[in-house]
Each structure stands twice: as C-alpha cells, then as structure tokens.
C-alpha cells in the first residue's frame, strides 16, 4: 500500500474510529529501538489497545504491542509492551495538553506508517462514543451502502 508521497501504511487501528469520535489528528515521530524498527517494518505491530498520555511536557505511547524480532537473540530484543516516547514540537504538545484536559477527550493511535524511511504515528484526539452513537454510525453507513447499491442497479 505505497502512496505517491512515499508513505507505506504498516498498521491501522480501525477499531479506534468505531469506539471514538475523532475530532483532530496529529502526525508524530516515535522513539524506537533497532529491533522494534525491524519488527514494525515486518508488520508485527498491534495498535488496538493503545493510548497516549502527556506527562512532564512529553507525549508517551502506552499498550502498543510490537512483537520481538525473530532473528534477534533474547538478550538484544525489546520488551513488546514498553512505553514509547512520541516526538512532537513543543507548541503542538502545549496545544494538546489544553485539549486532552477537557473532560472525555483521549489520544489514540490511528495509524503507523513509513514516511521517507521514518516510522510515524498518526494520533487522533477523540471522544468516546456511547452505544447509541455506535449504532447510529452503523445505521448511517448501512444506509449509504443501500443508496450506492440502488444507484448501481439503476
């Protein structure tokens, strides 16, 4: 899935768009170890349970599972669930702090991709959906599908 801008999507968190109403997105870099980069390039990453927190003026990514690299020994391999630092400009972090402190807003990873050889993460600022919101979204999506099918047949 290489796009024209040199972007290759490695992992996508489709569940996040179902569980959260995404209000804004941010592109961030991520601080990784060598074996983590190799595993990510092999597609061995899971963003599903991940979230980000702002602590001491830094953004940290939690609960992202990056599988240990197959060819590396146990001594040199990384901890799959370790907390990883996200790289953002100070101004972006300041804006983020104000928004995250609002009640009900959280940072979730939406996508991990390669951009010109660097691993990037797209963070989404989201508000959790209630069950009726999820049903409404699903209903709208189904109506769109029905409309498209009707247009195709006509």
UniProtKB/Swiss-Prot annotation:
It is found in: Cytoplasm. Pfam families: SmpB (PF01668). SUPFAM superfamilies: Small protein B (SmpB). Residues 133-154 have a biased composition (Basic and acidic residues). The keyword RNA-binding applies. InterPro entries: SmpB, SsrA-bd_prot, SsrA-bd_prot_CS. Its main location: cytoplasm. Residues 130-154 are annotated as: Disordered. GO terms for cellular component: cytosol. Required for rescue of stalled ribosomes mediated by trans-translation. Binds to transfer-messenger RNA (tmRNA), required for stable association of tmRNA with ribosomes. tmRNA and SmpB together mimic tRNA shape, replacing the anticodon stem-loop with SmpB. tmRNA is encoded by the ssrA gene; the 2 termini fold to resemble tRNA(Ala) and it encodes a 'tag peptide', a short internal open reading frame. During trans-translation Ala-aminoacylated tmRNA acts like a tRNA, entering the A-site of stalled ribosomes, displacing the stalled mRNA. HAMAP family: SmpB. This is SsrA-binding protein.
């Amino acid at each position: 899935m290489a796009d024209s801008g040199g972007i290759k999507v490695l992992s996508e968190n489709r569940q996040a768009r179902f569980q959260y109403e995404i209000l804004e997105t941010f592109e961030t870099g991520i601080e990784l170890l060598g074996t983590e980069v190799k595993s990510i390039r092999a597609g061995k990453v899971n963003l599903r349970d991940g979230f980000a927190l702002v602590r001491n003026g830094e953004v940290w990514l939690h609960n992202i599972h990056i599988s240990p690299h197959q060819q590396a020994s146990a001594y040199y391999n990384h901890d799959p669930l370790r907390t990883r630092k996200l790289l953002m400009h100070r101004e972006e972090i300041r804006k983020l702090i104000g928004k995250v402190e609002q009640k009900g807003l959280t940072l979730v990873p939406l996508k991990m991709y390669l951009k010109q050889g660097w691993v990037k993460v797209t963070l989404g600022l989201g508000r959790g959906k209630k069950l009726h919101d999820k049903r409404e979204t699903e209903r709208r999506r189904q109506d769109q599908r029905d409309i498209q099918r009707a247009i195709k047949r006509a």
